[in-house]
Amino acid sequence: MKIAYCIPALYYPSGMERVLTLKANYFAEVFGYDIRIILTDGKGKKPYYELHPSITLHQLDIDYDELNGMSFYKKLPKYIAKQERLKKKLNECLHQIRPDITISLLRRDINFINQMTDGSLKLGEIHFNKSNYRDLSNSRLPAFLQTIVSNYWRAQLYRQLRQLKRFIVLSHEDAREWTELDNVEVIHNPLPFFPDQISDNSHKQVIAVGRYAPQKGFDRLIS
């Protein structure tokens, strides 16, 4: 079995990158699958999490990181050009690899993953809840532009997701949110270890570690 994952980069610590690494390593080590990971950014940077030695990385070097900090109006033409470049290079890469399954982690490649002509089954895997995916509320765009862009993105996204063989979410709660789709499957995040003991709730302290952002829900721990 040959599986190709599409993700922007692996050089920084984050939940999506950690989960992908755990699953890819397990598939390679336990099942002996041929795992390929296709990247668009982070050329020359070492993966933050250790990968099984049999896993192959394919760096397309699109460099979306270059767009960080640019204004919307300056970024837009550059983004469109990079999307066209990614579409071409990804199709070439998949034809070279010839995977049985290609899995998009719903980053920039999801806009055209179904147009790839390599013949592999196409899956999508999302590591965000629906309300926070493609959320422009914190952008510097005027409110009316936020609405226009968000509605366009979501309509385009639903069209692409319907064409996937399966669309994978992390929980049954998440699955209930995607009412527009009938191809949703639930695969929970893996546990990297099992605790040696279970709390008896005698210590009334909670320790939370994570990025301080609205979707992490730290405010809900304090109320």
Residue ranges of model-derived segments:
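A structural motif in glycosyltransferase catalytic domains
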Residues: 20-23, 27, 206, 221-222
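Conserved donor-binding/catalytic core segment of Leloir-type glycosyltransferases
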Residues: 199-216, 222
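N-terminal strand-loop element at the rim of the active site
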Residues: 6-13, 26, 30-77, 177
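Carbohydrate-associated surface elements
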Residues: 173, 190
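Short N-terminal targeting/anchoring amphipathic segment
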Residues: 90-109, 121-123
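Active-site proximal beta-strand in glycosyltransferases
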Residues: 3, 101-103, 116-136, 147, ...
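Membrane-proximal helix-turn-helix segments that form the acceptor-binding/catalytic region
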Residues: 88-92, 144-167
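Acceptor-binding helix/loop patch of EC 2.4 sugar-transfer enzymes
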Residues: 64-76, 124-152
